[in-house]
């Protein structure tokens, strides 16, 4: 599957982190979690940009709605499950229509340290039809955080830290925090910035080697990845881990 990706794909562990959802009316959204919580500020699930955007408060009527497929006037989703090395792998192919876009949502609508909520709970709160975890922002004190056009944290984690930037038009870019500031990304039109990595595929080429990735994959942790295939055509991958099921 990775050889078919024309865009970029980022990989990150799922451990009680941050989630990406497909909202019932407009697009994708994302969540956060972890252990001892500390609230910094309340967070709006609405997108804040200088350009036109589709609000998550709208409504859509599903024309297809099954356990493995969904379609309405803003999105089409197809889900398949595979088993490799005794691990369940879930793959969602998502096509977003019109002005709908990827969106994010924080646990308890709160930006803070280790604010915790189940992915399913946050997904339900924003009327999501598809949800996966995302980055580790709440477990760290640094690393860019932009959610729905709001700049929440501008401190760089590391000059070589790779982030996924999602723009209003749905395009992806992988940046290193040492090359650009969070404010500059916001000025360029970034709507979401997710701090994880490493980048797995860039421009149809594998972008990691054993020194980047293999060591991190040795533990039995859940993993998730998001990639862009072409314009507003995405793949989301989740592998199970740390479970007896």
Model segments located where?
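Structural recognition of the beta-strand scaffold that forms the well-ordered cores
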Residues: 129-133, 165, 227, 235-237
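Domain-core and long-helix interface of multi-subunit machines
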Residues: 193, 201, 205-245
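Short, solvent-exposed aromatic-acidic interface loops
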Residues: 107-111, 178-182, 239-243
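Active-site-adjacent helix-turn-beta-strand microarchitecture at beta-sheet edges
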Residues: 70, 132-212, 217
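Short coil/turn connectors at secondary-structure junctions
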Residues: 127, 160-161, 168-169, 195-196, ...
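A short, polar/proline- and glycine-enriched secondary-structure boundary/capping micro-motif
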Residues: 112-116, 183-189, 219-220, 245
């Amino acid at each position: 599957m990775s050889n078919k990706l024309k865009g970029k794909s980022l990989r990150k562990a799922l451990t009680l982190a941050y989630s990406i959802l497909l909202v019932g009316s407009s697009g994708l959204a994302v969540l956060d979690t972890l252990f001892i919580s500390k609230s910094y500020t309340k967070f709006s699930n609405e997108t804040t940009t200088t350009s036109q955007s589709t609000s998550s408060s709208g409504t859509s009527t599903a024309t297809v709605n099954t356990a493995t497929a969904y379609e309405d006037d803003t999105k089409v989703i197809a889900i398949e499950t595979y088993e490799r090395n005794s691990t369940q792998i879930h793959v969602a192919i998502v096509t977003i229509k019109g002005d709908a876009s990827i969106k994010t949502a924080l646990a308890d609508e709160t930006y803070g340290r280790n604010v915790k909520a189940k992915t399913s709970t946050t997904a339900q709160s924003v009327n999501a039809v598809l949800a996966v975890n995302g980055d580790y922002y709440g477990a760290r004190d640094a690393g860019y955080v932009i959610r729905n056009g709001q700049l929440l944290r501008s401190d760089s984690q590391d000059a070589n830290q790779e982030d996924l930037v999602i723009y209003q038009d749905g395009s992806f870019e992988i940046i290193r925090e040492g090359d650009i500031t969070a404010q500059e990304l916001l000025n360029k039109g970034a709507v979401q910035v997710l701090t994880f990595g490493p980048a797995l595929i860039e421009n149809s080429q594998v972008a990691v080697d054993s020194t980047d990735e293999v060591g991190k994959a040795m533990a039995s942790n859940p993993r998730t990845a998001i990639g862009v295939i072409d314009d507003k055509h995405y793949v989301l991958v989740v592998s199970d881990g740390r479970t007896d099921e």
